[in-house]
Amino acid sequence: MSLQMLRSRVALARPTLVRPSVGQMTKRFAGTAPVPLTWERFLLLRTRRRQINFVASIFTGVATSVLAWGFISEAELDLEQQDVFFGLDAFTAAGLGVVAAGFMGSLLGPTIGQLIFKATNSKQWPAFLMKETDFLSHIQKNRVNPRYQSVSNPVPDYYGEKIGSLKDYRRWLRDCAKYNRAREV
């Protein structure tokens, strides 16, 4: 067997990736290329995610309260005024149960909100996560030491939660520098 035939048999035995020419790729995939995520767009998406999480918290809190109220009202419990639950009368205990269910439901809201946000922005999700990691490292690097806070010198937004635009980020950096200058005096 010749060396060329041996090479071709080895090449056929291994799976290879077939790459189309660059011209065909750009024609074929020109409309599906993801748009790079700018800082302005990232901060807008971050604000939108916070809004979605807030609305989802309200919705799940109300929904679990309604479900708890439905369960308590439909349950075949013999609730009389003389019944005592945890030292409280039955109606007070039922009301506190509905409030507790609403509170637990509102804690579930951000998880559902995150799923909704991820589903609506699935194309930009990987770029969003990378930008968020980069953004949080910037915040961690530039944040101030809260040990030196006082009533006249409060800590400026320690976690950067109020940053919604590049203008807000620059203002946050100026506030951090102002805090550090006031600390040194």
UniProtKB/Swiss-Prot annotation:
Name of the protein described by the UniProt record: Presequence translocated-associated motor subunit PAM17, mitochondrial
InterPro entries (alphabetical): Pam17 (IPR013875)
Lineage: Eukaryota, Fungi, Dikarya, Ascomycota, Saccharomycotina
PANTHER family attached to this UniProt entry: PRESEQUENCE TRANSLOCATED-ASSOCIATED MOTOR SUBUNIT PAM17, MITOCHONDRIAL
Self-association and partners: Component of the PAM complex, at least composed of mtHsp70 (SSC1), MGE1, TIM44, PAM16, PAM17 and PAM18.
Top-level taxon of origin: Eukaryota
GO biological process terms held by the UniProt record: protein import into mitochondrial matrix
Listed transmembrane segments: 52-72, 84-104
GO annotation, cellular component aspect: PAM complex, Tim23 associated import motor
Transit peptide limits: 1-29
